[in-house]
């Protein structure tokens, strides 16, 4: 067995690792292109089918609901049958759903297609588990940062493709998205090897249920993996709260109108991409994952508090730097530590539970933030989100500096 200092020695991604991460990056980006092609066009499809604004809201939300519900299931499937089959099944489901979406003739079919799209898109946990299987521990945070940066590019490409394709007919965007899923399926089938190495006696080993995994996080929040899940969910709540009211904040505070709001979101997207793709790796090498989580939590809280205090539009771009720095340090590092502390035989389930907590935050945060914005003022959502992140973020300062291996309670 190698000495601890050998385990933590940092070097560049080895060539086989880089190839695997490249495939995961492409998978995440192409998947998000398909999502972004469809998402902004949803209201137009629904209006053509005589949907009410309330019905449109449910159709738009159905993707996230299905995604958070399916994430633990995909993780569990990947623990039992392998990461590669789970990713391929998710891509196939998404492709079929996009095709149905393009030819939907009723609201029920449209809703069904969105639910299946969300379920197919719940395989993010599997990609994270794949990194835990295939990438050296000291390089997982950087790899996860690259993978999480890729969807930002996918959104940009997808938005342009979707609006352009709609000109040629309502079925075209759905067909394009389905074609991309097919391309992604073939690409993954050919280039992504299985990462889940089955050990002797693994088939006979009792497997931890999804219910037990959730129960551990809720009932024993002081355990390390539970702490990491809570930190991840709280960070996602803060980030989602900010993004959900960002346009309203710009309009209320600086009178930014709809035709001028695009560059602000583009700038935010570029910052997110740059921080995860470029800054995260050196930061983790210097601070370690635990240090990055602590600094990321502090930066996220400061960023949330700073938004309501911005004195002028000239200062806003500087304040906007804080959130991307915080989330870039926080999310990939938290996920990387989960892979180190979790039982390898239940890693997919653990990643799925974490994604379910994050998905719940993505659903709850916009509803709560917009309500607080309307009832208590523009600054309230930021302050409340900062307080929640700060309280849960205290758990980050109770994390050990170096993993000693999977916790015994996670292996049952």
Describe the role of every protein-language-model region.
Residues 50, 82, 103-108, 310-311:
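Helix-breaking motifs and short loop linkers at transmembrane-helix boundaries and internal kinks
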Residues 113-152:
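Cytoplasmic helix-loop-helix junction between adjacent transmembrane helices
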């Amino acid at each position: 067995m190698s000495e601890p200092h050998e385990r933590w020695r940092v070097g560049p991604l080895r060539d086989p690792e880089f190839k695997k991460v490249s495939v995961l990056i492409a998978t995440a980006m192409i998947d998000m292109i398909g999502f972004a092609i469809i998402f902004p066009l949803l209201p137009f499809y629904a209006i053509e089918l005589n949907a009410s604004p309330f019905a449109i809201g449910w159709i738009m939300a159905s993707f996230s609901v299905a995604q958070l519900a399916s994430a633990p299931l995909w993780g569990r499937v990947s623990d039992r049958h392998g990461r590669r089959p789970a990713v391929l099944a998710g891509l196939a489901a998404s492709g079929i759903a996009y095709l149905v979406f393009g030819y939907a003739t009723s609201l029920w079919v449209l809703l069904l297609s969105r639910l299946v799209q969300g379920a197919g898109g719940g395989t993010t946990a599997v990609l994270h588990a794949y990194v835990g299987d295939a990438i050296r521990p000291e390089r997982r945070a950087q790899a996860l940062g690259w993978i999480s940066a890729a969807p930002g590019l996918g959104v940009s490409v997808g938005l342009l493709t979707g609006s352009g394709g709609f000109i040629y007919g309502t079925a075209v965007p759905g067909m394009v998205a389905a074609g991309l899923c097919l391309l992604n399926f073939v690409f993954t089938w050919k280039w992504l090897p299985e990462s889940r190495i089955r050990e002797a006696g693994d088939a006979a080993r009792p497997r931890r249920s999804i219910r037990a995994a959730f129960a551990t996080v809720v009932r024993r929040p002081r355990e390390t993996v539970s702490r990491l899940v809570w930190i991840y969910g709280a960070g996602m709540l803060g980030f989602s709260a900010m993004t959900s009211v960002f346009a309203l904040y710009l309009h209320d505070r600086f009178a930014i109108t709809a035709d001028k709001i695009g560059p602000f979101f583009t700038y935010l997207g570029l910052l997110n991409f740059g921080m995860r793709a470029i800054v995260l790796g050196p930061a983790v090498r210097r601070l370690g994952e635990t240090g990055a989580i602590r600094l990321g939590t502090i930066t996220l809280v400061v960023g949330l508090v700073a938004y309501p205090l911005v004195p002028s539009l000239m200062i806003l771009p500087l304040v906007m730097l804080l959130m991307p720095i915080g989330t870039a340090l926080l999310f990939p590092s938290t996920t990387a530590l989960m892979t180190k502390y979790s039982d390898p035989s239940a890693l997919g389930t653990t990643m799925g539970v974490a994604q379910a907590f994050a998905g719940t935050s993505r659903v709850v945060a916009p509803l709560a933030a917009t309500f607080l914005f309307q009832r208590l003022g523009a600054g309230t959502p930021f302050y409340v989100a900062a307080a929640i992140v700060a309280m849960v973020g205290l758990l980050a300062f109770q994390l050990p500096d170096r993993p000693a291996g999977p916790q015994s309670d996670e292996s049952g």
